[in-house]
Each structure stands twice: as C-alpha cells, then as structure tokens.
Regions:
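Beta-strand-rich recognition/accessory modules
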Residues: 61-147
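Short, well-ordered beta-strand segments enriched in hydrophobic/aromatic residues
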Residues: 1-5
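Active-site/ligand-binding surface loops and adjacent short beta/alpha elements
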Residues: 10-92
C-alpha cells in the first residue's frame, strides 16, 4: 500500500492491510509473537502488556503498535500463518464474535467461527503524517507452514 500526499499541506493517514483468514475453528487458534508487547483493546479502551500466547475469546479488537511479525496457529488445520510487515507497522487482531457477527448483513451468524484477521496497520498514535510530495509504504507478507 502506498500513500502520496499530493496537496500543499501534510496529511494524517491511518491504514491497514486487512486479512480475512479462513481458520478451522476460532476456538482452536492462538497467536504468538505478542509476548511482552504493549497493546490496546479497542472494545474497552484498556491498555496492557501482553503475557504469553494470545487465545481469542469472544469479540476481539486488539492493536499492538510495535509488533511487525506474528504467527497465527490453527490447531484444527495443523498449520501456522506468519505475518511479516515492513516499515515498523503495528499488528491488529480482529474477530467480531457471535453477538456482533449476528448484526452483520454480509456474514452468516456463525461465520465468525471460521475466520480471524491478523493485520498490518498504522493507526491511532502511529498514524502516518505525510508531507506534501512524500510517499509512505506499508508492505506485508503472509506465509503458511504445516504445524
């Protein structure tokens, strides 16, 4: 993703590379690579330092501003998906959970169980400030490996 400021003033931009990853069952996944990193829960506004492996429970909207690589472990499909980002971007974890998913017109009521998002982002305090004529890039790669 590349953003260029074509105007005469600096602009502030938040961006994310969204991934809707298919998983065997959201109740049987975990995310590693977050240990010891500061994060924020967008649902509650709570800030925290993460300890251990992340296991989602219910609705998940968590941002880790200083995490540029992480791994999703899918225990049903016996695989891991590695996210790697460049440019010092953050990591956002998202799943709507059952209640929020039921309100989405474009998702089946139990579809949240078969997907999870692990995304590369620049948002909040880490949003880009792009000067006139400047271009900023966000790059992300995903790779799948047996586990």
């Amino acid at each position: 993703l590349a953003c260029t400021s074509l105007g005469s003033k600096a602009v502030r931009i938040e961006c994310a590379l969204h991934t809707y990853l298919a998983v065997g069952d959201v109740d049987h996944i975990s995310v590693s690579g977050l240990q010891g990193h500061e994060g924020e829960d967008f649902a509650s506004g709570e800030k925290f330092v993460w300890r251990g492996e992340f296991v989602p429970s219910g609705e998940c909207r968590k941002r880790f501003p200083r995490v540029s690589s992480a791994e999703l472990h899918d225990k049903v499909w016996h695989r891991k998906i590695r996210l790697e980002s460049t440019c010092g971007s953050g990591c956002f974890l998202w799943n709507p959970g059952s209640e929020r998913c039921a309100g989405f017109a474009d998702m089946e009521k139990d579809e949240y169980r078969r997907m999870f998002c692990i995304e590369s982002t620049f948002a909040g305090d880490d949003a880009w400030r792009i000067k006139p004529g400047e271009t900023r890039q966000l790059k992300m790669s995903l790779s799948e490996h047996p586990e």
